[in-house]
């Protein structure tokens, strides 16, 4: 991939201060994009800024706020919008959740994607723009220790597909695609849950992680997304994302 393949393009990444978001911001910057990174943690964003330099613009804000979604969409008109922000669910079986903890990811992850996807359609973003949402492989397999997380991530996948349909109906030319990353200890959320599921199965964490197969890293997530937006464009609404790359879902 050329270092300047995305030269002149603006990318906006939510949850850009750590984990997948940071890896995605780094990959897009390396491909030549001007990256706007949104997160609530100013210090984390400043670390990314120090690493990436002037190609990265930090914006300290709550990505779940609908006003923030509207203001930043209007201000930056991104050609690439990556919706990665989300909350870490509490690792406990359902009988130990309250409705407040069970629904945490509906109030954060789903609301965040809904607000930004809505703004992308209403603006609308320019034809040829791509909106990438981060769902989870838990949307396919469930996640009995994470409350409403799997359901929330399934909702994100469907929201993205609905947006793709609306873009096609209105001839907007905006691409919408959802990625479902596998569980990985390489992110803060993943590290919590590899430990939790290892304990639930009565095995050590290293053995549990080994059973997940080829590990997925934030760097690989960034490369996968950059490949999607620099190629001919996604030809499916959703892809499973593993350490081996992208696999289309039907």
Q: What annotation goes with each model-predicted range?
A:
Residues 10, 17-18:
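Conserved glycine-rich cofactor-binding loop
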């Amino acid at each position: 991939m050329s270092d300047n393949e995305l030269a002149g393009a603006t990318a906006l990444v939510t949850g850009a201060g750590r984990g997948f978001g940071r890896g995605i911001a780094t990959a897009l910057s390396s491909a030549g994009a001007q990256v706007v990174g949104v997160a609530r943690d100013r210090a984390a964003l400043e670390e990314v800024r120090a690493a990436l330099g002037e190609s990265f613009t930090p914006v300290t804000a709550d990505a779940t706020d609908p006003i923030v979604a509207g203001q930043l969409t209007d201000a930056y008109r991104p050609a690439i919008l990556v919706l990665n922000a989300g909350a870490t669910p509490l690792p406990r079986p359902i009988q130990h959740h309250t409705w407040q903890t069970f629904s945490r990811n509906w109030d954060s992850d789903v609301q965040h994607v809904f607000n930004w996807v809505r703004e992308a359609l209403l603006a609308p973003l320019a034809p040829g723009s791509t909106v990438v949402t981060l769902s989870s492989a838990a949307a396919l397999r469930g996640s009995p220790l994470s409350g409403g997380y799997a359901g929330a991530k399934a909702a994100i996948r469907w929201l993205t597909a609905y947006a793709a349909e609306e873009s096609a109906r209105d001839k907007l030319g905006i691409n919408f695609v959802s990625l479902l990353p596998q569980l990985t200890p390489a992110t803060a959320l993943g590290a919590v849950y590899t430990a939790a599921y290892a304990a639930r199965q009565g095995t050590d964490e290293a053995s549990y992680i080994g059973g997940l197969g080829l590990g997925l890293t934030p760097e690989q997530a960034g490369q996968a997304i950059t490949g999607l937006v620099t190629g001919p464009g996604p030809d499916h609404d959703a892809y499973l994302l593993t350490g081996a790359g992208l696999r289309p879902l039907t």
